[in-house]
Regions:
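Transmembrane-helix signature of polytopic, membrane-embedded enzymes
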Residues: 11-20, 105-127
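Extracytosolic helix-loop segments that constitute the early lumenal/periplasmic catalytic or substrate-binding loops
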Residues: 23-25, 41-64, 71-74, 78, ...
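Short acidic/glycine- and proline-prone juxtamembrane loop motifs at membrane-interface regions
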Residues: 130-143
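Membrane-interface alpha helices of multi-pass inner-membrane proteins
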Residues: 133, 166-181, 322-326
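Membrane-interface transmembrane helices that cradle and orient dolichyl/undecaprenyl
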Residues: 9, 111, 115, 151-169, ...
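Membrane-embedded architecture of ER/inner-membrane glycosylation machinery
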Residues: 168, 262, 298-560
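Transmembrane-lumen/periplasm boundary regions of multi-pass, lipid-linked membrane glycan transferases
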Residues: 185-334, 339-342, 348-350, 363-370, ...
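Transmembrane-helix motifs of polytopic, lipid-linked glycan transferases
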Residues: 92-112, 150
Length: 560
């Protein structure tokens, strides 16, 4: 089938319906309870900013926080100021930045490819599993990828057209990306700029007045973040951060942040495996992983032929950046999110190639259909096989019926077979992620004792009462949903304490053994749901890995 015919047809309802379905995934994800640790932790940090009207200091629990810069927390705190302390308000800035990212990636791709290919680039990015996850398990990555994508588009636009407005907007976006997560943003943006300049042979732009303009705008836009760091850390060398004193915020953001991750000092080493991001990518870019690999193989095979200079652009950037971040001794899967725009751009070329073929390559067709089957099998398992009490049963039946109807409708479309295959996978990923966001994640939240305790307190006389704890161990979910951070009670003051005390199973056993009287306000099941394992997923063995958290009302010993 002629590619132009496909591209014309792709303007019709099927594409629009895929975007609507994908948007529903993100929209419904706004209303799922926050997950500990990072997502709930960052929400509490932003909540403190808004409650205390203190936007200069980053505080994690009872200690100053020197890790991620301020931008994500500022945006979330502003959302709280506007809409109140709700989990959807915390996620809203990240969702908006993912929309910015998607639009920017579309326009960025449109500088080099036609409109239809660019639409696929944007959809591949927005539907990658790790990007969808970043919209519900909100850390700093959604805001980061939004600003990075905007910077990539604007700087590429400047290199292609030399419009000053694009240079200024790119510099602002790069500054905000740097203010969100530090040097990783500049690494990706900087390498992309250098590769683009090299391919277009426009090195003269680096030694022109444009460079000074970009540097000025960038410096101006990072100054609020630098000022906040200076006030909190440079003026207080007595602060002890990760066992070290005399820490300077300015030195940290310009040097130590990346060095700590590369060396594993401070944050610790969690992976020396240089292939960590390779196997992480295999699931993070689902369901399009095979398409990227196909594009990579295609590019290598065509190495001896004449290639468009921008065809190799995303691969060259990835070839430089990917090994650099793989050398870090501290790695987490979501660190790859910032590269997803490049993965999507690289994959779209393979999609265009497949539409030139009369038939879809058998290996690609087989693997993509297996992924589709996996999505529906996993969706059924998540709904029926994990939790005995099922939520949103009607929604599940409706979703399954609509998905089956959509698959049947796609089968009868007179489109290229590869086009139908892509639509199959789009339906599958929307199906599984709607189940995750409307059923699985909300049910997981019921195993966060802090969340369920706070829900119960809202309808009790203790709704606005302060709560104490005996250790600095995190209680982010309770902090956020009670809208008050728990206070620390010294063990020596326990006998004279009067009020609410939130304790672990071990602490409860000790209080009970001491003979101290108490009123049990609540007893809730606790599990670290961000670290799922087979014993938890199996209802028969779940109790082996769960514990309890207790909320007690204590009175002073002398008054009894």
């Amino acid at each position: 089938m002629d590619q132009n015919l496909f591209l014309t047809k792709f303007q019709f309802t099927p594409q629009r319906l895929m975007w609507v379905g994908l948007f529903m995934v993100y929209l419904l994800g706004l209303f799922s309870p926050l997950i500990e640790n990072d997502s709930a932790q960052f929400a509490v940090m932003a909540m403190r900013m808004a409650q205390e009207n203190d936007y200069l200091h980053l505080i994690k629990g009872f200690e100053p926080y020197l890790d991620k810069p301020h931008m994500h927390f500022w945006l979330s705190a502003l959302s709280f100021e506007l809409f109140g302390f709700h989990h959807w308000a915390y996620r809203l800035p990240s969702l908006l930045m993912l929309i910015v990212a998607t639009v920017s990636i579309y326009r960025w791709s449109n500088l080099f490819y036609n409109t239809q290919i660019s639409q696929w680039v944007a959809f591949l990015f927005a539907s990658a599993q790790t990007i969808i996850l970043s919209g519900i398990d909100v850390r700093t990555d959604a805001v980061l990828v939004g600003f990075v994508s905007l910077a990539l588009y604007q700087f590429s636009s400047f290199i292609e057209t030399e419009k000053k407005s694009a240079l200024i907007l790119g510099s602002v976006a790069a500054a905000f990306a740097f203010s969100t997560k530090g040097q990783i943003a500049l690494l990706v943006i900087g390498i992309a700029i250098l590769v683009h300049l090299s391919l277009r042979k426009k090195w003269k732009l680096l030694v022109s007045h444009h460079f000074l303009l970009a540097l000025f705008v960038f410096s101006l836009c990072i100054s609020p973040m630098l000022y906040a760091y200076y006030i909190q850390f440079d003026q207080h060398p007595e602060l002890i951060i990760r066992g070290q004193g005399e820490r300077t915020g300015l030195k940290f953001i310009f040097w130590e942040q990346s060095m700590e991750r590369l060396s594993g000092e401070g944050l610790g080493k969690n992976s020396s495996n240089y292939f960590f991001f390779v196997h992480s990518f295999l699931w993070e870019f689902l369901p399009w992983t095979v398409l990227f690999i196909g594009g990579l193989i295609l590019t290598i095979k065509r190495n001896q032929q004449k290639l468009s200079v921008m065809e190799v652009f995303p691969y060259l950037v990835l070839l430089i950046v990917f090994p650099l971040i793989s050398m870090a001794q501290f790695k987490l899967p979501h660190y790859l999110n910032v590269l997803m725009p490049l993965f999507a751009l690289a994959t779209a070329k393979f999609i265009a190639y497949c539409f030139h073929l009369k038939k879809t390559p058998k290996s690609v067709k087989l693997i993509q259909l297996l992924i589709l089957l996996l999505y529906f099998t996993l969706g059924m398992f998540l709904f029926f096989g994990i939790f005995e009490e099922r939520v949103n049963s009607f929604l599940f039946v409706l979703l399954l019926a609509v998905s089956i109807w959509s698959l049947r409708a796609v089968i009868h479309l007179k489109f290229h077979s590869f086009e139908r295959l892509l639509m199959f996978n789009a339906i599958g990923l929307i199906f599984i992620n709607l189940i995750l966001n409307t059923s699985f994640y909300p049910k997981l939240a019921e195993f966060q004792a802090g969340y369920t305790t706070a829900k119960e307190l809202k309808a009790s006389p203790y709704a606005k009462s302060p709560i104490y704890k005996l250790t600095a161990k995190h209680s982010w979910a309770l902090d956020f949903y009670h809208q008050r951070s728990l206070k620390l009670l010294k063990a020596a003051d326990l006998d004279l304490f009067e009020g609410l005390l939130y304790v672990s199973q071990e602490e409860f056993d000790a209080i009970k053994a001491s003979g101290k009287t108490y009123d049990l306000i609540s007893k809730k099941t606790q599990f670290s749901v961000s670290r799922l394992n087979l014993k938890f997923l199996n209802p028969k063995t779940r109790e082996q890995v769960t514990s309890y958290r207790y909320l007690l009302q204590l009175t002073p010993s002398e008054t009894r």
